[in-house]
């Protein structure tokens, strides 16, 4: 078989699927006549047919040994299975790509019909696909070197800062469509980002690290990102540019509200980044799947008309929100896994450059370098994002809104060693305070929810556990006192000391 010819044909029709030559032939100029050429063609065709597994049975009927055909395919191409999906190595692109029914059918039809005209039958395909699935190696996400990032023109090592050639040994199934060019810059983009972040260097550095984190093949940062703000503030611009850097085909757009639905997160499989624009959220979000994906835990994903899979992802999650989502999960674990980025700059209509994205798309290799700078700083800082006062402010406000008990602890309930308040007085003061402040209790005014929320908030903010003492059958909360001046109606109360 002329593997080089076949490879060139496949590259033209199948976007670069590589087929290896079975043998290397020296180019020798030998004058031969047309009859000999036809005879050689027949010999080559017969050789192809035999290699593919074709044979004639005792009744002289053409048959196909599918096991032999599978062995032949594995000799001329590289296959793997990842996340339950059969994939073939595309040497032109430098990544493994899904070998869907249409693609395998095109390859088999070409091979069979060039060996024996009109020999292809669709019935062969299912047996061959099933055989490949049972034979080819399975690839786990964990075996991919997380110091490597696949770009259009090579594989970048974030430690050595070297660009390596694409190679199937890296097992990449995604890559950025952008070329890495060491000296490339992006002055237009940098100017826009400074304006979007209101010249806040801390916030800009944090945003740069978020962009860089989207390229890294691990979840060590363990964060999802809420881009929040109303009006024309740059959220969409940032998401569109990051999508260009990561690659449109590598980005899903599943909304936060879908994460609790049965088939809601099916679309994240094999994706690098999820960016979703969500203007309104109907109710409190469920955080179970969200936190599992943020941490890179293995989760079970239901798929329509397919078998469910256990999936371990390195996907990064970004949500564009006008208002932050309500949640019943007020644990430290939830707030530790989200990073809220405020977009406070509101651009007037006359200040908006309608062609800004188009201009930035001419300097994407420079934007890529800007992202890599953020990725390298994040890695060197042990995956901790640059602290930002703007981020801290919006996060504090969100936590207090979602968990009014925490705001009560900060405003009304004062830590003071030796003091104590009755358990009932602490809850009554809380109810009085939220009523006076016009704050929704969000169910925290029940004794059990209140006590649990207060204990969580005390652990997070004061690094201590609540302790109680019983006096004459009455429970007292130790080492706290109520600041009655913060309540709507001041009443004379007695505080007991040990």
What are these regions (language model features)?
Residues 9, 13-16, 74-75, 119, ...:
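Positively charged interface segments
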Residues 61-69, 198, 243-248, 283-299, ...:
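A short, contiguous, amphipathic alpha-helix enriched in charged residues
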